[in-house]
Every structure is written in structure tokens, then in C-alpha cells.
């Protein structure tokens, strides 16, 4: 997958984003996805790739992914006050971390991206731990955050629980507070963007169980896995 993606001409959202003469770009959604995926391949499987293959993937992250992401962070202020900037941080940080064995100067980008991540989480989460978007967006946003927290904790030589900020833990308590009391109590309330019957993904539940020590998250994780609601993600790996 990573080698195929690295051979694509562009990681832009559409042909319009790479059309000569255009100034339009649909934000760095696909660039984030490919930076994240290719970064994980370099980190987890880089040792079994040839040096040339590693270089191809690294070059693609550097030239096709990170520049578009950096453009959004430098130009689009609004992404710092909603979930987009937080989600884009996944590809930005995991991609940059994967480059360090080849290019240690990317450490400065990691420092900047880490500061941005915590700033944006603080912007997104209110004093009571809540957010203005519904629980489906909340779930998606913090499912994107957790792998970054684990990766940055490893990079900084800390446990995830020690690395996690008070804001991140506080909004986890909000997630529990937004569970419905109807039925088995494992679904979140259908407010704002959320539909009836929505539930938090097992990976997010497992992550918050580890960060908070709250056994309710562990119960949610076990319930979701027992119901066969798990989807492939990075946590089982």
C-alpha cells in the first residue's frame, strides 16, 4: 500500500487541487491519511523494506503530504478552532516522527506540531470538558488523537497516562457523561451530528481506560468487542 501510494503523482483531494493555475485546495484530508499510513509503515515495517523502498516512502511523505498539511496550518486559522486541525495533526505528527531515523532535523517540526496539537485541543474543549460538535464528531476527533498521544509519549519517554493533559482527560469524562441511559447504556446521546445507536469505537474506549483508569471505559470496550463492533484499527496491533 505505502509503495503504491508513494508512486502516485499527488496526494491531493482531487485533480483540481493539483491543476496548474488553480489556487483551490480541499484541505489536507487525503494528505493526512497517507502521511499517517505511510508513517506507520516506516515505523512498524521499515526494517523489512529495502533502503530504496524506505526512501521512496519518506520522499512521498516529505514532498506530497507534509507540504499541503503545513500550508493548512500556516494559512487556515479556522482549523485551529474545530476538529480539522486536530485530525490533521495525526498525519502531520506520525509522518514527521517516522522521518527521524533518516532526517533528525524533523524534530523541530514535531515540536511545533506538538504545541499546535495541545493548543487546538484546548481550543476545542470547553471548561466543562464538552465540545460544540456532537458525539460522533467527538468520537472521531479523539480517536484520531489517541494514536498521536501514544506516539508522542513514546517519543518523550513517558507513559501515555503521564503524557496526557488535564484537558484530554476532562473531555473523556464528558464522553462518559454523554452516554444514554436507555438500553444497555453503551450508546451515546443522539445530539447535534450524532444518530441513534451510535457508540464509541473500541480503540477509543481502550485508550481512555488506560489514561483514566475508569473501569467504565473498560466495560464499554469489552461490550463493543463482544458485540462484534470492533473495526480494524491500530490498537490491536
Predicted regions and their residues:
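Sec/Tat-exported extracytoplasmic proteins
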Residues: 9, 42-45, 149, 179
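Short, glycine/acidic-rich hinge or "gate" loops at secondary-structure transitions
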Residues: 15-20, 51-57, 157-164
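Short coil/turn segments at secondary-structure boundaries
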Residues: 16, 76-80, 186-194
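Active-site lining segments of carbohydrate-active enzymes
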Residues: 21-136, 146-147
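Carbohydrate-active enzyme catalytic cores, enriched for enzymes
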Residues: 99, 137-237
